[in-house]
Regions:
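Bacterial signal peptide processing site
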Residues: 27-29
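Surface-exposed, charged secondary-structure patches
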Residues: 120-121, 210-256
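C-terminal motif of bacterial Sec signal peptides marking the signal peptidase cleavage site
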Residues: 22-25
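Surface-exposed loop and turn segments in beta-propeller and other repeat-based domains
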Residues: 93-112
Length: 286
């Protein structure tokens, strides 16, 4: 618990130091920073040395993720910042065409101590493409991490993903995507099941089918906040080779006032060589 408090305090402090609120969506600020100007110059050069890092098709989706190095040098390191470009089409229709992401489009006040991370394709459902992206001080865990959701209706949403730096982090991945699917209109049941199967055991799948997709949220998160909350996680020190108890915590956006929690049991499995991996949710309860 003390570790979580320290991590949450660090995240809130970082957000406070970086100023301005977390921006959800694609709207960009009007203030021009030095790295924005450099990034603009790179853009005007037609993305010199553009590198395709992901070119993937799934069902009727086609996703291309590209990177290009900018002229912005990271302070204190012999490294340069980058731009990530995301292009997504569905059924042959282009939904996002070289959608540009920089560290300042993730969070407007990130300075040149931070470097945009690599982008990772997390999940593709019937409704949404999920990509993770962050900005960190090189060779450290200090920075901000986000889940980007590109929906089939052409809308984009950005979710802050606070990192606990322990076995519980993937729980937040699951909750962000599962919650996003629950907020679709109409909700696509197959997409919910896909996310659950990617992160849960057969026992957890059975629980969701029996108790319903909203059963893994505190009642007030559903009724009062309509699932529009900040989600975080923490591990406990009480675990064995079979199970690892964790908690998921729900907060209002940009607030440290806890709404409620849920208990999460992770199921362990032995690694190929040694150790135990806790990478599946087995049950979520009050």
């Amino acid at each position: 618990m003390k570790t979580l408090i320290r991590m949450r305090a660090l995240t809130l402090l970082l957000l406070s130091v970086l100023s301005a609120g977390l921006i959800i969506g694609c709207k960009k600020g009007s203030k021009k920073t030095a790295d924005e100007e450099a990034n603009k110059a790179t853009t005007e050069q037609n993305y010199k040395n553009l590198k395709t890092v992901i070119d993937s098709t799934y069902s009727d989706w086609h996703i291309i993720i590209q990177e290009v190095e900018t002229d912005v040098k990271i302070e204190g390191y012999d490294e340069f910042d980058r731009i990530v470009l995301v292009s997504i089409s569905k059924d042959g229709e282009v939904l996002f065409d070289k959608e540009e992401f920089t560290k300042t489009s993730l969070y407007s006040s990130l300075d040149n101590h931070f470097q945009l991370s690599d982008a990772y394709l997390e999940q593709i459902t019937n409704t949404t493409v999920y990509i993770s992206l962050g900005a960190f001080i090189p060779e450290t865990d200090e920075g901000l991490y986000f889940m980007l959701a590109f929906s089939k209706d052409g809308h984009f949403k950005k979710y802050l993903h606070p990192l606990a730096m322990d076995d519980s982090d993937f729980i937040v991945d699951f909750y962000i995507m599962y919650t996003h699917e629950n907020l679709q209109n109409p909700v696509d049941k197959a997409s919910l099941q896909q996310i659950a199967k990617a992160y849960g055991t057969p026992n957890f799948i059975e629980q969701l089918e029996k108790e319903g997709p909203l059963s893994i949220y505190p009642p007030e998160v559903v009724s009062r906040y309509k699932l529009d909350v900040q989600i975080e996680s923490e591990s406990t020190e009480e675990y064995n080779d079979t199970y690892h108890p964790c908690k998921v915590l729900f907060y209002p956006h940009e607030s440290d006032k806890l709404i409620s929690t849920m208990n999460v049991e992770l199921k362990g499995r032995k690694g190929e060589y040694d150790g135990v991996y806790y990478d599946r949710i087995d049950r979520i309860s009050r």
